[in-house]
Amino acid sequence: MTQITNVSLRRILDSRGNPTVEADVLTQSGGFGRAAAPSGASTGEYEAIELDPAEAIASARDHVAPRLIDTVHAGNQREVDAALHAADGTDNFSQIGANSAVAISMAAAKAGADVLGAPVYQHLGGTFRGESFPTPLGNVVGGGEHAKEATHIQEFLSAPIGAPNVSEAVFANAAVHARVSEILDERGIPAAKGDEGAWAPPISDAEAFSLVNDAVADVEDDLGFEIRFGLDMAAAELYDDDVGGYVYGDEVKSTTEQVEYVAEMIAEYNLVYVEDPLDENDYDGFATLTERVGDQTLICGDDLFVTSVERLQTGIDADAANSILIKPNQIGTLTDAFDAIELAREHGYETVVSHRSGETEDVTIAHLAVATDAGFIKTGTVQGERTAKLNELIRIAEDAV
C-alpha cells in the first residue's frame, strides 16, 4: 500500500525570497505527501551540506528516485531514510544535498500517514508520544545574523510556560510581540523586522533585556499566567578566532567573561532558556556554564550539536548543556532527528524542535514536536511561514484531545 511510485521535486520560494527544494511523494495506494526544506542564516560548522536547490534537485532525481520508486515503502520511515543515505553515499549529504534529503524524508512521512488516514504526528509518534504539548518559544526581538544594525544577541524569546494550553501560549507570544512594538513606539524607537518577524530595533543588548522584560511582565499581568523569556545567543557568530573572544561591538569577552555574563543575565532576568551561549566547538565552556546554572535554566546546544548523535554523545560525555535543538535539515532526515531525540531523552536532555530563519509554509516540525513529546517548539511568533506551524500546533492539540 505504501510502496513509493513517484518522487517529484521542484524549486519554490522560501520566506527570504530564496529558492528551496520541495518534494512530492506518491504511493501505490494513492497516499500523497508534500514537504519543503528550510534554510538557516546562522548555520553550524558541522551541519549537513545544503546544495544549490537546482543542483540538489538534479542530483536527487539521478540518485534518489531510482532507489525509492517501486522499491521503498513510505510507511517505513527508517527504510526511506536509509535509502536516502545509500543514494548519497557521504556522511553529510554532500552528494544529493541535505535540502533534497530532508524534503523527501518529510514528504514520505506525510505520504505514509496519508495512506493510514492518520495525522503525521500519530504516524511518527509511536512510543514517543506523551500527554503533554510543546511550549512555543516566540522570537520577539532579534538581531545577529537575522537583522543587521540591531542587537548582538540573535533572539529574545517569549516563553509562556504557565499557559493552560497550546492556543493560549501561542496567543501570549503574539501579545508579547505586540507589546514590544507598543513600548518601542512609546520610547520613540523605530524598528523594522528581522528574518523571523521579530522586532529589530537599533538598541543595545542591555536595552533589549529591559524592553523584553517589561513586555513580558505586562502581558503576564494581563493574562494571569507565568511568562518568562529566553535567548538564542548564536555565540558562534560572536566568537572571533583571531581575537580569541566574543565580540560585542567594541568589547571583547573571554570565555570566562562570557560564562560570567550569561550566568548574570540568567540570574537577573530569570531566563528559562539560553541557546548557544558559547562557541560551537567549546564543549568545556558549555560544561562550565551548565554546571553553574543548569539547575536553574535550559542550556541548549544548536550549533554545538547540529542534531547529530555523535556530537550529542560528545556533549553528554562532557556534561555540556542539558537540552538540544532539533532541526531535521541540519542532519538530513527524520530518522536522524529521531535518533538524536532518543539519545537526548535517554540522558535527561530536554528537546526543542526548531524552524530555520528561511522557512516555507511546511508544518512538519509541528507534528514532529508533538510526536516526540518535545518540551518546546521554536517557530517564531508572526508572519505566515511561522504562523502556519503555530496554527497547525493549535489544530493538533484540538485533534488530540
Swiss-Prot record:
Disulphide bond pairs: none
Keyword Protease: no
Binding positions ((2R)-2-phosphoglycerate): 154, 327, 356-357, 378
Active site (catalytic residues): 196 (proton donor), 327 (proton acceptor)
InterPro entries: Enolase, Enolase-like_C_sf, Enolase-like_N, Enolase_C, Enolase_CS, Enolase_N
Documented EC number(s): 4.2.1.11
Biochemical pathway: Carbohydrate degradation; glycolysis; pyruvate from D-glyceraldehyde 3-phosphate: step 4/5
Keyword annotations of the record: Cytoplasm, Glycolysis, Lyase, Magnesium, Metal-binding, Secreted
One of the protein's GO biological processes: glycolytic process
GO molecular function, one term: phosphopyruvate hydratase activity
Subcellular locations according to the entry: Cytoplasm; Secreted; Cell surface
Residue positions binding Mg(2+): 232, 275, 302
Cited SUPFAM superfamilies: Enolase C-terminal domain-like, Enolase N-terminal domain-like
Gene Ontology CC: cell surface; extracellular region; phosphopyruvate hydratase complex
Obligatory cofactor(s): Mg(2+)
NCBIfam families associated with the record: eno
HAMAP family listed in its UniProt record: Enolase
Described function: Catalyzes the reversible conversion of 2-phosphoglycerate (2-PG) into phosphoenolpyruvate (PEP). It is essential for the degradation of carbohydrates via glycolysis.
Name assigned to this protein: Enolase
Protein source organism: Haloquadratum walsbyi (strain DSM 16790 / HBSQ001)
Taxonomy of the source species: Archaea, Methanobacteriati, Methanobacteriota, Stenosarchaea group, Halobacteria
